[in-house]
Structures are given as C-alpha cells and as structure tokens.
Amino acid sequence: MKPTSVIIMDTHPIIRMSIEVLLQKNSELQIVLKTDDYRITIDYLRTRPVDLIIMDIDLPGTDGFTFLKRIKQIQSTVKVLFLSSKSECFYAGRAIQAGANGFVSKCNDQNDIFHAVQMILSGYTFFPSETLNYIKSNKCSTNSSTVTVLSNREVTILRYLVSGLSNKEIADKLLLSNKTVSAHKSNIYGKLGLHSIVELIDYAKLYELI
C-alpha cells in the first residue's frame, strides 16, 4: 500500500525533527519534506501529491491561514493540521474558520499531535474538547468582538509590530511594499481604537497574541 505522505513545516529544526520521530510510530507515514520555507512547500505541491501538512501557524514570509488558501488552490484534497504556541482560544477558532482539519497547541502533550494525525487521516477533524470549550467561553466571546475584526494579514503584522520590527523589516519578511504595510498598520490602529505602539503591545498581551 502506498505510504501516506506528510510535510512538516516549523521554524524550529528541533521541532520538525521531534515531530518526525513521533510520527515514526506509524510505519504507514512517510515524511517527504521538512522545511520552514513556504516557497519550497509550494514547489513540492506543484509536482507531487501530498496527503497531510503539519504546520506552525507562524511561518516566515506568510501566516498559516493565508498559506492554507494557497495550498488548497494547488491541491484541494490535502489535509492540514495547525500547530501553535500562541493563544489557543484565538488561533484554534481561526483554524476552524479557515477550514483546517485540526489544531494542536504546542503547550499540550506531544502525543496529541500523533493522535490528531491519526484522526485526520481517518477522515475526522481534531479540535480537542478543551479547545472547543475554550472557544465558547466568555473570554472568547469578549475576544470575538475585537480581535476577530482583524484580517489574518493584520494579525501577522500586529505581532511583528509589537515584537519591535520596523515597517521596512515587516515588508521584507512578508514580501510587501512599505506602503502596504503602512496601510495595514493604520487599519489595525483604526479597527482597534488604539493610538500608540505601547497600547498595541498591551492589547497583544491581553489577548495572548504574543
């Protein structure tokens, strides 16, 4: 039987290696690519079929949600499992909205990743019950009226801004023009009703975006 092909995408080599070792418990899985470069993944997808992509929501040059749309344009049947160490409430909710097949917090037991892969490849989705309950909680309801007004691109830029990157550095990372980044920055401040980087940092901490 043909092995199930898997791509692992994460910015940290040690995490990519750890996931690969974890998945070796299932001899039917074949890791065909490990990378943090979305362009390499796109090139691979254009020439070979892939069954599953396991990827961190935070990737150099893009965000996972934007990249998911790109993936589906190339291979509509590929399944996607998101990983993140950031706010489970916020990112798991967006993962569901984006059409991902699963979400696992990096703060959880690593075996959750293996279990999620097994579930997804069996035709199910994997969003742990505690995650779904967290999304439905009052905290997330409060969150939804504010953070969710931002687009995925704006969330990515917000996180770069509060980490201290300049407009030019953000533009270089996301392959955008300075003008486009400035426009996104203005939209972020306008949508959130904020006026300074200090307020933006406090906001990001409040909603666990950093």
From Swiss-Prot:
UniProt lineage: Bacteria, Pseudomonadati, Pseudomonadota, Gammaproteobacteria, Enterobacterales
All copies of domain HTH luxR-type, residue ranges: 143-208
Matches recorded under InterPro entries: CheY-like_superfamily, Sig_transdc_resp-reg_C-effctor, Sig_transdc_resp-reg_receiver, Tscrpt_reg_LuxR_C, WalR-like
Compartments it resides in: Cytoplasm
PANTHER family: NITRATE_NITRITE RESPONSE REGULATOR PROTEIN NARP, TWO-COMPONENT RESPONSE REGULATOR
Modified residues (4-aspartylphosphate): 56
Response regulatory domain span: 5-121
Any single Gene Ontology cellular-component annotation: cytoplasm
PROSITE patterns: HTH_LUXR_1, HTH_LUXR_2, RESPONSE_REGULATORY
Organism the protein comes from: Escherichia coli (strain K12)
Protein name: Fimbriae Z protein
Main location: cytoplasm
Molecular function as annotated in GO: DNA binding
DNA-binding region: 167-186
GO biological process terms, semicolon-separated: phosphorelay signal transduction system; regulation of DNA-templated transcription
Pfam family, one: GerE
Endpoints of the signal sequence: none
Alphabetical UniProt keywords: Cytoplasm, DNA-binding, Phosphoprotein, Transcription, Transcription regulation, Two-component regulatory system
